Amino acid sequence: MSRLKDKFNETIKPALVKEFDIKNPMLIPALEKIVISVGAGDSAKDQKVLQNMADTISLIAGQKAVITDAKKSVAGFKVREGFPVGIKVTLRKEQMYAFLDKLISVALPRVKDFRGLPKNGFDGRGNYNFGLSEQLMFPEVEYDKILRTHGMNITIATTAKNDKEAFKLLELFGVPFAKGK
């Protein structure tokens, strides 16, 4: 079992039960999944760059990434139906905890002038979204093998009913939030 899953079972669950006065153990907020997604943008036209981006995300996540296609044509964006528009990978169970541990303890501390993740990334239903400007902060990524640097969006889905519960859950996991608002 991963370090964060042990921490969740031993310390975080009891803290959440105490803080929110939860009677039913099935109502304790927990992590559901983590989705890492990248918009391909202009890179979608070059199959080699798109595949390189997918390989990079697969390395970071530890699971094969999927290239997503447009569901319908949009002339304003010069996109046709079936045209590749992004890359995503969904992590659950052990891989989810391993990725979150790597993100918190290795990747985010490597960011220059990192002041914490914004607190306004919650959606009102207990899920948290934030973006990273580049993929080079992860130790698996080798600078020489990257054709183009790109950012990524990370969504942490929880079973929490509201933002307050989700914030406390992520804070107890050790997610570094920005000080202040």
UniProtKB/Swiss-Prot annotation:
Gene source species: Campylobacter concisus (strain 13826)
Pfam families tied to this protein: Ribosomal_L5 (PF00281), Ribosomal_L5_C (PF00673)
GO MF terms held by the record: rRNA binding; structural constituent of ribosome; tRNA binding
Segments crossing the lipid bilayer: none
RNA-binding keyword on record: yes
Alphabetical list of InterPro entries matching this protein: Ribosomal_uL5 (IPR002132), Ribosomal_uL5_bac-type (IPR020930), Ribosomal_uL5_C (IPR031309), Ribosomal_uL5_CS (IPR020929), Ribosomal_uL5_dom_sf (IPR022803), Ribosomal_uL5_N (IPR031310)
GO biological process: translation
Statement: the UniProt record of this protein carries the keyword DNA repair: no
Key words of the record: Ribonucleoprotein, Ribosomal protein, RNA-binding, rRNA-binding, tRNA-binding
Function: This is one of the proteins that bind and probably mediate the attachment of the 5S RNA into the large ribosomal subunit, where it forms part of the central protuberance. In the 70S ribosome it contacts protein S13 of the 30S subunit (bridge B1b), connecting the 2 subunits; this bridge is implicated in subunit movement. Contacts the P site tRNA; the 5S rRNA and some of its associated proteins might help stabilize positioning of ribosome-bound tRNAs.
Family under the similarity heading: Belongs to the universal ribosomal protein uL5 family.
Domain of life: Bacteria
A GO cellular component annotation in the UniProt record: ribosome
SUPFAM superfamilies recorded: RL5-like
Name this protein carries in UniProt: Large ribosomal subunit protein uL5
Subunit structure: Part of the 50S ribosomal subunit; part of the 5S rRNA/L5/L18/L25 subcomplex. Contacts the 5S rRNA and the P site tRNA. Forms a bridge to the 30S subunit in the 70S ribosome.
